Structures are given as C-alpha cells and as structure tokens.
Swiss-Prot record:
It holds the Pfam family zf-FLZ. The keyword Zinc applies. The keyword Metal-binding applies. Residues 113-159 are annotated as: Disordered. Keywords: Metal-binding, Zinc, Zinc-finger. This is FCS-Like Zinc finger 2. Belongs to the FLZ family. Residues 113-122 have a biased composition (Basic and acidic residues). It comes from Arabidopsis thaliana. GO terms for molecular function: kinase binding; zinc ion binding. Induction: Down-regulated in response to mild as well as prolonged energy depletion. Down-regulated by the glycolysis inhibitor 2DG. Up-regulated by glucose, sucrose and mannose. InterPro entries: FLZ1/2/3, Zf-FLZ_dom. PROSITE patterns: ZF_FLZ. GO terms for biological process: response to glucose; response to mannose; response to starvation; response to sucrose.
Amino acid sequence: MEVSMRKPYFIEEEDDGFVSLSEMEAGVSSPSCYNYPQSYYYNHHHHQYSVSSPRSGKFHDFRFDNSYYGYGQPHFLDSCFLCKKRLGDNRDIFMYRGDTPFCSEECREEQIERDEAKEKKQSLSTSVKAMRRNEKRSSSSSPTRSRNYAFRTGTVAAA
C-alpha cells in the first residue's frame, strides 16, 4: 500500500507555483498560506490561486475570476445585448443562439439580420479569395498557354 506524502501547511522553502500532474489529478493544490515575511503579505496576494475538482476534472483559476475579489461582471441576463436596456422585472427575455438575451423580438430580429449580413459578407469574401487563388494557380501552372490575346495567324513579310 502506497502512502502519499502531504506537504506541510506552512512551507519554509520558496514555492515555484507549479503543481504536478499527480497532485492535480488528486485534487491537491498549493496551500493558501505561506510562511513569508510580513512585508510580503502587504505586497502580494496570498490566497489559493487554483482548485481542481477530482470528480469533474475541471480546473478553476481564481486569478482570472473577478467575482472572487468582490467586483464581478454583471450576469449575462441583466441587460439586452443590443440596446443594453435592463432585463428582468418579470418581463420576457428573448434568447438568440442560446446565450444572447434581448428585451424584445425587434432587438432579437435586428441582431439576427446583422449576423446574417456579416456571415454573407464573410462567405462572399471567402469565395472571392478562393476564386482568385484558383485563377492564380491555373495561370501559373501553364505560362505558355494563350491568355485570350487577339492575334492573327498567317504569313508575315518583312522588308
């Protein structure tokens, strides 16, 4: 039977911030408190930066989570995506593509039209680029081939 060694709660040596793969799989992370000089606490954050869940295998990094610091981003259902009007108060919310809220069908339709126009423009741009690429490829593959230049065949007499 294998006995796993646990790190002491207070670490005397310097921590490089890396967690081994086996520690991540086991759900172990760096301790949240270190035995640093008191001046370090005033200049650096000393909380646990990351947590991995052994059940889900997901890894959450609190360094990029603003809600951890008390000033989180507003919930995505707080305002209309297009006109930024406040949502809620038992009014209907019109969703588009699963995660985009709108205050009315009109705002939702406007966004749908914008997205369709954008997709159409990208599609045209892509097809024009492909056509130019094919044109360039065919012209460079046979340089001696006639390029529809007008010329006459026959005898030329020069004096």
